[in-house]
Amino acid sequence: MPIRRVKARSSGIRQTVIIDYKKVLTTSTPEKSLVVSLKKHSGRNNNGKITVRHHGGGYKKKYRIIDFKRDKINKVATVKSIEYDPNRTSFISLVVYEDGEKRYIIAPKDLKIGDRILSSNKQIDIKVGNALPISLIPEGTFVHNIELYPGRGGQMIRSAGSSAQILGKDETGEYTIVKLSSGEVRKIANGCMATIGVVSNEDHNLVVIGKAGTNRHRGIRPTVRGSAMNPNDHPHGGGEGRSPVGHDAPRTPWGKRHMGVKTRNKKKQSNALIIRRKK
């Protein structure tokens, strides 16, 4: 993936590292039939109160409707373009099926214009872009866009550069064991679909935004340190000068422990499917 380090013509771009999209993307115009408008809420609820901090502003962007289900079975599709999607870190591909229907999918690494891909509930070629039930994929294969429940659509392994590896079947034969990019090992029901390959834009983690204005363009507002606030605004606030937080552990603005606390629900049914937690 081409990475470009911007020349230091000003302080704002001195350390900037960006993806050279011109060498990767094939078009800058999305398919109109697969684009819808989004209304911004700036982190507010229906009462106008802030429920998510640090959201607001940013450039206008339209949502691309992505086919996460890959449920057009046994219909060959041809890749027409590799495009940028402002709503996710990976690239997307426009594919056209035999009957003329157009859909967007998450673009895997090494997928090229003109490639023909297929979704099936039977055994097909294990090649990049093909989607099939996870039980039919051989051990050692890297996959993405994995369903957690059959027919619900891919919910895991969708961000740039991510992938999961098939490790084999469990002792009952009802589940397939996969290793996620986080290191977690878990069971996936055999009927769940997965797509072959690694998600595109694998160098996304090397990007350096360079200046605060880039985050403002993305709709991310500044984060104020709790220690810089007053004591009625934050548990870390108050004191003379640079005072310590005054607690046995860092706290959230609402007084809860902030670091090293597990947030997963202990009663979640899917806990039984996790063989080894992430590292």
Swiss-Prot record:
It holds the Pfam family Ribosomal_L2. Keywords: Ribonucleoprotein, Ribosomal protein, RNA-binding, rRNA-binding. One of its GO terms (molecular function) is transferase activity. InterPro entries: NA-bd_OB-fold, Rib_uL2_dom2, Ribosomal_uL2, Ribosomal_uL2_bac/org-type, Ribosomal_uL2_C, Ribosomal_uL2_CS, Ribosomal_uL2_dom3, Ribosomal_uL2_RNA-bd_dom. Residues 254-279 have a biased composition (Basic residues). One of its GO terms (cellular component) is large ribosomal subunit. The keyword Mitochondrion does not apply. The keyword RNA-binding applies. One of its GO terms (biological process) is cytoplasmic translation. Residues 217-279 are annotated as: Disordered. Gene3D superfamilies: 2.30.30.30, Nucleic acid-binding proteins, Ribosomal protein L2, domain 3. Belongs to the universal ribosomal protein uL2 family. HAMAP family: Ribosomal_uL2_B (MF_01320_B). NCBIfam families: rplB_bact. One of the primary rRNA binding proteins. Required for association of the 30S and 50S subunits to form the 70S ribosome, for tRNA binding and peptide bond formation. It has been suggested to have peptidyltransferase activity; this is somewhat controversial. Makes several contacts with the 16S rRNA in the 70S ribosome. Part of the 50S ribosomal subunit. Forms a bridge to the 30S subunit in the 70S ribosome. This is Large ribosomal subunit protein uL2. The gene is rplB.
